[in-house]
Amino acid sequence: MKVKILVDSTADVPFSWMEKYDIDSIPLYVVWEDGRSEPDEREPEEIMNFYKRIREAGSVPKTSQPSVEDFKKRYLKYKEEDYDVVLVLTLSSKLSGTYNSAVLASKEVDIPVYVVDTLLASGAIPLPARVAREMLENGATIEEVLKKLDERMKNKDFKAIFYVSNFDYLVKGGRVSKFQGFVGNLLKIRVCLHIENGELIPYRKVRGDKKAIEALIEKLREDTPEGSKLRVIGVHADNEAGVVELLNTLRKSYEVVDEIISPMGKVITTHVGPGTVGFGIEVLERKR
């Protein structure tokens, strides 16, 4: 059985994983103030160029989801490439309509399509995608894969935790007032967030990167004891030094058996701003 795994561009999937695990990415869109729209393609040079452009932009662009037709074209393309099944893992349905577009399109094609609402975002999404691919390569059926992913998501084995370091984008996006943004930047305030039951939840404000990193690991510690085995995707929006420091600190408390760094794409960066640092976590084994 030949299965194509498809994620949306908010997954921030590591570039090397796309070929290694046969994971494809369908873009969301960035819409600039003058009406120009551009796809959130998973291309290294495009992403680096976007970081520069959004820093220089006078306003924060808006974003939009893939259309039903976008998904339909992808499904039909995979059928032409002789895939038997398509497995789609999307950004949380509580954060975007992408899941709904994927489901509606699946009803209009004659290739089996299974759509999973991961209730996750960013670097957490490629982790269940990799689990699915490894299970399929070991002979699992698509039904067994879906059951395992459901079990592990309910067990909170996949997590997305990060911090926002620049209030300018929260101000430009209308999320905080100019005064709050001024004070936040002046005091080097970092806003720590995580995905909980599919929703983006701010849980702490701290001063400086070091305290923000400590707050991220403290959030992980709530249900994952120190010494547990982890697979980690470190993500960042034009702040690789920050994510390296985060991973170095994480390794002091956890057994990180696999790690990779992946830049955040255009759409995620639009919402959180350059400078953001975080990680997608897969708990492989919780220490008793």
Curated annotation (Swiss-Prot):
Residues 3-283 form the DegV domain. It comes from the Bacteria. It comes from Thermotoga maritima (strain ATCC 43589 / DSM 3109 / JCM 10099 / NBRC 100826 / MSB8). GO terms for molecular function: lipid binding. This is Fatty acid-binding protein TM_1468. InterPro entries: DegV, DegV_C, DegV_domain_contain. Monomer. Transmembrane segments: none annotated. PANTHER family: DEGV DOMAIN-CONTAINING PROTEIN DR_1986-RELATED, FATTY ACID-BINDING PROTEIN TM_1468. Keywords: Lipid-binding. Binds long-chain fatty acids, such as palmitate, and may play a role in lipid transport or fatty acid metabolism. Hexadecanoate binds at T63, S96.
